[in-house]
Swiss-Prot record:
The keyword Phosphoprotein does not apply. GO terms for molecular function: NADH dehydrogenase activity; oxidoreductase activity, acting on NAD(P)H, quinone or similar compound as acceptor; quinone binding. It is found in: Cell inner membrane. NCBIfam families: PRK06076.1-6. It comes from Bradyrhizobium sp. (strain ORS 278). It is an enzyme of class 7 (translocase). It is a multi-pass membrane protein. It comes from the Bacteria. It holds the Pfam family NADHdh. The gene is nuoH. Its main location: membrane. NDH-1 shuttles electrons from NADH, via FMN and iron-sulfur (Fe-S) centers, to quinones in the respiratory chain. The immediate electron acceptor for the enzyme in this species is believed to be ubiquinone. Couples the redox reaction to proton translocation (for every two electrons transferred, four hydrogen ions are translocated across the cytoplasmic membrane), and thus conserves the redox energy in a proton gradient. This subunit may bind ubiquinone. This is NADH-quinone oxidoreductase subunit H. It catalyses: a quinone + NADH + 5 H(+)(in) = a quinol + NAD(+) + 4 H(+)(out).
Amino acid sequence: MADFFASSFWTGFLWPLIIMIAQSVLLLVVLLIAIAYILLADRKIWAAVQIRRGPNVVGPFGLFQSFADLLKFVLKEPIIPAGANKGVFLLAPLVSCVLALAAWAVIPTNLGWAIADINVGILFIFAISSLSIYGIIMAGWSSNSKYPFLAALRSAAQMVSYEVSIGFVIITVLLCAGTLNLSAVVEAQHARGLASLIGLPQLTILNWYVWPLFPMFVVFYVSALAETNRPPFDLVEAESELVAGFMVEYGSTPYLLFMLGEYVAITTMCALATILFLGGWLPPIDVAPFNWVPGVIWFALKLFFMFFLIAMAKAIVPRYRYDQLMRLGWKVFLPLSLVMVVVVAGVLHFAGIAPK
């Protein structure tokens, strides 16, 4: 027995695998609980803008409303349309949800707090977000209904249009940080920047990329809204036009999985914005008592700030027409992001401040 625990199979493969599985389960539990309260916050913010109370019955201040909704969905009977392709119909919400959760494998919430701290973490998330379109297309096609099919076509065009802009945003951050490793991007915002140039390295907030790359931050924010089908770009599930879009034939647990995948994707975009532009887990001022606060708390606060911006867009901005959505993506954001890539590369080169 002692020989087994000393073997290379145990130390080099089995034990690291057990640790990774335990980390994955812990992350999944924490993430799902966080999603429950992010969904509640979304409803509360929307209610506050409309001057009403919002969910306030289940638990104190409605804190357990999301768990009651979970129970309601799980206990309902799933209904599959007679003409639907049953296998693809049931697989679509699983694909959507699993892909959204997979992106969190590479997101660090603190220094060293990532299941897989890979050197191409940004590209991994970008690839996962690109694949998420398949869940929507599968749902739209397999439902054998015109409304889901139209929503799937809209979604394909919408996601392709705004992934291009997000790709150029990633390139500008790559130019500034010199790496695609998410932890290294955060550390780059601590080590160098405006605060170092003016001789105040404690003001780490001045090193965050949101200041020199503010136009790209705006492009990323709006593109994230479009990428995750959030208002004012919720053309895929427009209630007044397509009833509920690609989810119109879904109910019970499959519908819940789609909703879960949507909110996990929104949270992923908020986390990515936090890492790329807001310094990740870094405190705004690197002095006591700010640096006494654990980095994961700063990360959570910044993530919720980004989600608040997304929730406010849902509450106050009217829905775009589809032609306006396409025009914004191809005629405004694409040229702007291309110009910004050239400008950032030029400034870094001629100022001699490009990362080595």
